């Protein structure tokens, strides 16, 4: 099984470290990852117009649009992406609850916290949630549907 993960952190040095550790934690559970890295919330949101991610690993304190604001915007989009905050801003953990994240990973305790979040993901997210999606490009952006939500598809003109 392979899942798509978006990693968003303004610290360029942290991106490869977090990506590598997250990839290892998921592989230990038999889940392979495709991790895309973003250095701003704006870049992440732009990418999400074209791509669906299963999980977003999101720093909180970033210039411009902070991680809480990005999380709120993701919830407004309503695609069911799981948000995991990865941050040194431990004092903002309660503020993150407004976004209903899957978890909060402290950078100071990263390896233990990421392992716990991966375990939670495996236990709470059914096979259907981790895969079995169809994506359609529309004029207004990317539309993602669970295959069980689709009752009928009709093509016209040059569509197949």
For the regions a protein language model found, what residue spans apply to each?
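Conserved SAM-binding loop
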Residues: 7, 37, 85-86
């Amino acid at each position: 099984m392979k899942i798509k993960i978006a990693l968003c952190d303004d610290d360029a040095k942290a991106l490869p470290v977090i990506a590598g550790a997250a990839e290892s934690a998921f592989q230990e559970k038999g889940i392979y990852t495709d991790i895309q890295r973003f250095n701003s919330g704006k870049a992440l949101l732009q990418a999400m117009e074209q791509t669906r991610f299963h999980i977003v690993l999101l720093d909180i304190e970033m210039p411009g649009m902070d991680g809480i604001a990005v999380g709120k915007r993701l919830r407004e989009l309503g695609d069911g992406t799981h948000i995991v905050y990865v941050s040194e801003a431990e004092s903002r953990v309660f503020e993150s609850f407004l976004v209903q994240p899957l978890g909060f990973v402290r950078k100071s305790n990263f390896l233990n916290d990421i392992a716990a979040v991966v375990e939670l993901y495996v236990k709470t997210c059914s096979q259907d949630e981790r895969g079995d999606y169809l994506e359609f490009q529309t004029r207004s952006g990317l539309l993602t549907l669970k295959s069980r939500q689709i009752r009928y598809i009709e093509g016209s003109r040059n569509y197949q």
